[in-house]
A protein has these predicted regions:
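PRPP-dependent phosphoribosyltransferase catalytic core
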Residues: 58-130
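A contiguous pocket-lining binding segment that forms or flanks enzyme active sites
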Residues: 33-75
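Short, glycine/charge-rich flexible loops or terminal/linker lids adjacent to PRPP-binding catalytic cores
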Residues: 2-40, 49-54
Length: 130
């Protein structure tokens, strides 16, 4: 997973968290060590509506560890659960989103103006914050 690259680069331990507990083996949702003193940065490649992130955060909460924030490469901008993160005072940091991608695609003429408008209209109709 993407988190492994971050952990290796920063020389920090990595813990793997599943969306749900395994039905076999140790029957655990968390693989690796996680203690009450630990500070956790949840690192993922994508964030759609944040639903799976909430499951991960619940597992981290149950372990007693502290959640420092969520880092994703691409945020789709579906804001269904965004306010839950804000309410829990958890920062969501992302490298890019639809707005950035469309801006670069337009500036570099990868997409025509009309094509960018079509995508933006679609995103607006889907209530996706770009």
């Amino acid at each position: 997973p993407f988190a492994a690259f971050i952990a290796q680069k920063l020389n920090l331990p990595m813990t793997y968290i599943r969306k749900e507990k395994k039905k076999f083996g140790k029957n655990s949702q968390i693989e690796g060590l996680l203690s009450q003193k630990d500070h956790v940065l949840l690192a993922e490649d994508l964030m759609t509506d944040g639903g799976s992130k909430l499951k991960f955060l619940d597992a981290i909460d149950k372990s007693g560890a502290n959640i420092s924030g969520i880092f994703v490469i691409f945020n789709y901008g579906i804001i269904k659960d965004y306010y839950l993160f804000k309410k829990k005072k958890i920062d969501v940091i992302f490298l890019t989103n639809w707005s950035d991608v469309l801006s670069v695609a337009s500036r570099k003429k990868i997409l025509k103006y009309e094509e960018v408008e079509i995508v933006e209209s679609f995103l607006e109709n889907m209530k996706i914050k770009s």
